[in-house]
Amino acid sequence: MKKIIVGFVLMLTTITSYAQQDAQFTQYMYNTININPAYAGSRGTMSIFALHRTQWVGLDGAPVTNAASINTPINESNVGLGVSIVNDRIGPSDENNIAVDFSYSIQTSERYKLSFGLKATANLLNVDFTKLKMLNPGDYSFENNIDNKFSPNVGVGFYLHSDNTYFGLSAPHLLETTHYDRYAGTGSKSHISKENINLYFIAGHVFDLSYNVKFKPSLLTKYVAGAPLQVDLSANVMFNEKFVAGLAYRWSASMSAIVGFQATESWFIGYAYDMETTRLENYNSGSHEIILRYELFKNYNKMVSPRFF
């Protein structure tokens, strides 16, 4: 039965009419630049981020994601810049996204800034069909592997934020790119992997429950054609601006426990464990995600305390 499930997962990632989605993160709130270019430079300091995520541990061919990024404001200007790399491995596919982000911010009120962002992405897709067990060995459509198939893309984002509140709307990939069409030139719409538009909305607010305790509920919704609407709800508490603990729920998919520690003024480490709430939980032992963030507090408007997002 487990092999059947594995085959089903691999089919979802490779066969006809697959609506491709962006890599999934539970701790997205610490690296929002991956989904919204307007986030670049919004923390007021250079921020370096790394992530490793192993999804559905124990299930062959399950997603493994590695990500790294750096973003910073440019001196006293309203400009922010960022660069990010995401590697996503699922079954026979190995995909790399290299992105450059640009943001421009305007002061809309005494408390709020509105940032506009642009993203340019280079996608490199590799698919090794020899890792699949073919139902029809004579199907020559899968005879040749895909090697570093290049696809460019662009994205946009808006980010309204203050010291304790944020809202964001973004589409990191606007171009609906067909990475590989096995019937190219015949007029068929059958394809192996198609990049559909992913639309994101995020929101969050930090409540000061006491001098040493902060509470932050947050929301992420993601829409992509051909896939169910994704809704992520999370609630995190920060103690003494050092320790973070919280819970998250991905609608009809999983529940998560999140912990974090601000080791120094610059270093933050976070961990999340996801447990499936679907029948898939019978075939894996959960998902693990660890993040590491390093920040240089050498900006013109140095933050008095670590920001919660």
Model region roles, listed by residue range:
Residues 14-16:
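N-terminal signal peptide c-region/cleavage motif recognized by signal peptidases
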Residues 20-309:
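Subset of outer-membrane beta-barrel
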Residues 2-8:
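Sec-dependent signal peptide recognition
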